[in-house]
């Protein structure tokens, strides 16, 4: 008998690949363990390859299984997107967009973009999530986000990008810092201070860029605290726990007890970038791109 791959096969495979345990996967699927085994063997027969390495103690994906899992995750993500878009259309809404962003996007273009987009398409449904750069890129690759506002040097092959804003850096110090009254402050004036920085989890390339600033100033910073949140950095600085370097735009929109010293003389610049997956067929993507190109 000739079998063909059906959606249920792929869903059974996905659950087993997540659990890597036949009994647990069968329980999630509300089927018997032998029934699940038959479905997986049927898939392996259709694909003419082994998808799982099985032993008495463990279950692991083969290389073919790992590849299939990547594709299956994208497939089910797209199916979820289709369902969401159909539901929005049924509600009378044009479409929905899922936007990821880092904090500095809120202080620059994001509010204006949302206002313009809502003006053009009042019924569009928008979900916002503040996320790290790395998380946004991962979610864009899986079609779990439609757009991301990130700070990156390079993007994966399936991700397109559009530079939005290039800016210099600023030094953040407590309002009561003893050097505050000194004229013509330089970064090297703070070389003995503890530094609070965005961590590598925020963006590896951004972290490396900031560290290059210190190298150019001929000192290694004493980095005592790292975080992925701008407000956390400002609160820590205001408590006298250190000083920080951030994109200059972050001086706007936060009510914090800190001062900003512009580092315009430093050649390093950081760019806020709009990123999206060129394989994503969400009908709202062209609408947002049209609006943002009008704003730039």
Q: Across the structure, where does each feature detected by a protein language model lie?
A:
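Short beta-strand-centered segments that line the small-molecule binding cleft or hinge
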Residues: 2-5, 89, 112-116, 127-129, ...
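Secondary-structure junction motif
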Residues: 195-217, 282-285, 289
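N-terminal winged-helix
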Residues: 33-34, 81-138, 201, 247, ...
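Hydrophobic two-helix hairpin corresponding to the core of helix-turn-helix DNA-binding domains
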Residues: 13, 25-26, 62, 117
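Flexible hinge/capping segments at coil-to-helix
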Residues: 91, 161-195, 283-286
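Short helix-boundary/capping micro-motifs
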Residues: 14-32
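A short LG(V/I)-centered, amphipathic sequence patch enriched
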Residues: 44-61
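A late-sequence structural motif
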Residues: 109, 259-296
């Amino acid at each position: 008998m000739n079998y063909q791959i059906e959606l249920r096969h792929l869903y059974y495979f996905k659950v087993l690949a997540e659990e890597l345990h036949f009994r647990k996967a069968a329980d999630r699927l509300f089927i018997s363990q032998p029934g699940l085994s038959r479905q997986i063997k049927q898939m392996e027969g259709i694909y003419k390859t082994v998808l799982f390495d099985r032993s008495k103690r463990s279950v692991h994906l083969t290389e073919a299984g790992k590849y299939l899992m990547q594709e299956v995750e994208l497939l089910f993500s797209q199916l979820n997107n289709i369902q969401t878009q159909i539901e929005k259309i049924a509600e009378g809404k044009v479409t929905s967009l899922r936007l990821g962003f880092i904090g500095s996007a809120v202080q620059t273009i994001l509010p204006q973009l949302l206002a313009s987009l809502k003006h053009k398409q009042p019924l569009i449904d928008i979900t916002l999530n503040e996320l790290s750069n790395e998380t946004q890129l991962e979610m864009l690759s899986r079609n779990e986000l439609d757009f991301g506002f990130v700070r990156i040097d390079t993007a994966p092959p399936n991700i397109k990008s559009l530079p939005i804003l290039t800016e210099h850096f600023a030094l953040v110090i407590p309002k009561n810092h003893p050097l505050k009254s000194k004229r013509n402050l330089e970064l090297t004036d703070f070389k003995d201070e503890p530094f609070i920085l965005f961590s590598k989890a925020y963006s590896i390339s951004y972290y490396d860029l900031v560290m290059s600033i210190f190298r150019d100033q001929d000192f290694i910073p004493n980095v005592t605290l790292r975080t992925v949140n701008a407000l956390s950095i400002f609160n820590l600085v205001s408590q006298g726990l250190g000083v920080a370097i951030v994109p200059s735009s972050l001086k706007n929109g936060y009510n914090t007890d800190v001062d900003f010293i512009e580092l315009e003389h430093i050649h390093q610049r950081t760019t806020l970038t709009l990123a999206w997956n060129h394989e994503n067929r969400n009908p709202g993507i062209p609408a947002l791109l049209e609006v943002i190109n009008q704003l730039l």
